[in-house]
Amino acid sequence: MLWEFLSERLSFRDPHDEGGAKNGRDLMKMFTKAAFAAAVLAVGAMGTAKAEEANYVLSTASTGGTYYPVGVALSTLVKVKLQPKQKIGMSAISSAGSGENVRLIREGEAQFGILQGLFGYYAATGTGPLAEVGPQEHLRSVSMLWQNVEQFIIAADAAESGTLSDVTKLSGASMALGRQNSGTIGSNAALMAGLGIDINEAFDLVYAGYGPSAEALQNGQVKGISTPAGVPTGAVSQLLASAGDSVKFLNVTPEELAAADGGRNLWTPYTIAAGTYPGQTEDIQTMAQPNFLATHADLPEEHVYMITKTMYENLPFLQAIHPATKAMAIEAAIAGLPVPLHPGAQRYYEEVGIEIPARLIAQ
């Protein structure tokens, strides 16, 4: 009870109170490290069948995005289904997002975290923004949660093939590829690099969120936009309803996907079904990367197994709490995961008949 009280209070701190935020982080650090140590010591040996008492912390992102409410949904499910008998609890906390979540898991301040797929790849390989700290060899995947679907839309008069290669021919044009320093512009930069394009040199970048980006395309202020998100995306719906045939939603060919992915095995094919958006009469073939649930390799196999099993046996519960989880399906549980599976998650997936590729088996 004390743990739940502190978790709830500290995760709802005033973002403008810097002193309070620091004190909250210090307190959270103390209690989460204690909880993590207690959980591991209580189990004694990894993989024991008996589920000992544990209270885990799930780090998400800011309260205004999707990560936080999905984290609350997951932690609520664990509390309702596992805490009464198995004594496995979970509390969701807000954070600065994927980058901080990697650090929190590494330092034992959180035992689970929601990560963008590309950031998981950076963590696994020690590249990008994690080049200085190196590979996070302790990081493990639990499940894909929902997918960030890549949505490239350009002015119709710039569309030659109607595929992603059209973007590579817009050198010198104004493009809206996300806010500055955002995950959106980071993933767009990685994808374009795979196609041989340095976005900072090739384009006149307009830094904006999805709504303003869509408006800029409709008004002719930019030649193209990219809005990776769950579908349907509100800004895209509004754009296609208003702009009609003056814009073109680009398809991604298998060859373009392979080049853009750059050997990461992160982006996978995704079909936006006809009728998803206004005026969309045909399927759109694009690609998507996962937002996924990560954990620490040292967590007990039995606990991660039970959490994974509980998630997939109670999808209607999750989906009733937040619509983003409607994308979850056992068939897509390991799609695009960038780091090896935790043995507990692997065990559950093998039980339900999912074939695990070698790259996702922890060594």
Predicted segments — roles?
Residues 75, 106, 114-132, 189-196, ...:
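A ligand-binding cleft/hinge motif common to bilobed small-molecule-binding domains
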Residues 10, 24, 229-251, 302-363:
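An extracytoplasmic/periplasmic, membrane-proximal ligand-sensing/linker region
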Residues 26-36:
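Bacterial N-terminal signal peptides that target proteins for export
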Residues 45-51:
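Sec/Tat signal peptide C-region and signal peptidase I cleavage site
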Residues 248-306, 348, 356-360:
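C-terminal lobe and pocket-closing loops
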Residues 55-84, 148-219, 335, 339-344:
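Bilobed "Venus flytrap"/periplasmic-binding protein-like clamshell domains
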Residues 91-103, 198-215, 231-234:
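Short helix-initiation/N-cap motifs at beta->coil->alpha
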Residues 132-151, 276-284:
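A structural signal for short loop-to-beta-strand junctions that line the ligand-binding cleft
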